[in-house]
Each structure stands twice: as C-alpha cells, then as structure tokens.
Amino acid sequence: MVQVVLGEDEGIESALRRFKRQVSKAGILADVKRRRHFETPLEKKKRKRIATRRKRRFR
C-alpha cells in the first residue's frame, strides 16, 4: 500500500505529485487495468512472452 506523509511545510500539490509518482512506480494502475477483464491462460502466456521479448531487446 502506498502512503504519503505530509510534512509541516509541504503543500497538497507536492504531496499529490509524490503520491502519483509512488503509485506509478509501484505499478498499481497497470495492475488494475490488467485485472479489469478476465484474462485467459493463453492471453497470460502471450502477454508474458511479449514482456520477455521487450526485456531482451533493451538489454
């Protein structure tokens, strides 16, 4: 779970920016989008295979 503790002199805008950055870094929104619809085992394998290819290409 992502938490942001507000400092004494910190504004809401900067805390919100920090929260958004932590959420995107944790991959929470990507996970929610992926789980929005049922994914068949074949689709899971295909997604993982594509992700593996991407990782290999950037090495």
Curated annotation (Swiss-Prot):
GO BP: translation
Pfam families in UniProt:
Ribosomal_S21
Q: Which UniProt keywords apply?
A: Ribonucleoprotein, Ribosomal protein
GO MF terms, alphabetically ordered? structural constituent of ribosome
GO cellular component terms, alphabetically, are: ribonucleoprotein complex; ribosome
Q: Check the record and name the PROSITE patterns matching this protein.
A: RIBOSOMAL_S21
Source organism, top-level taxon: Bacteria
Q: Which Gene3D superfamilies match?
A: Ribosomal protein S8 (1.20.5.1150)
**HAMAP family attached here?**
Ribosomal_bS21 (MF_00358)
Q: Which family does it belong to?
A: Belongs to the bacterial ribosomal protein bS21 family.
- Which NCBIfam families does its entry note? S21p
Q: What is this protein called?
A: Small ribosomal subunit protein bS21
- Gene that specifies this protein: rpsU
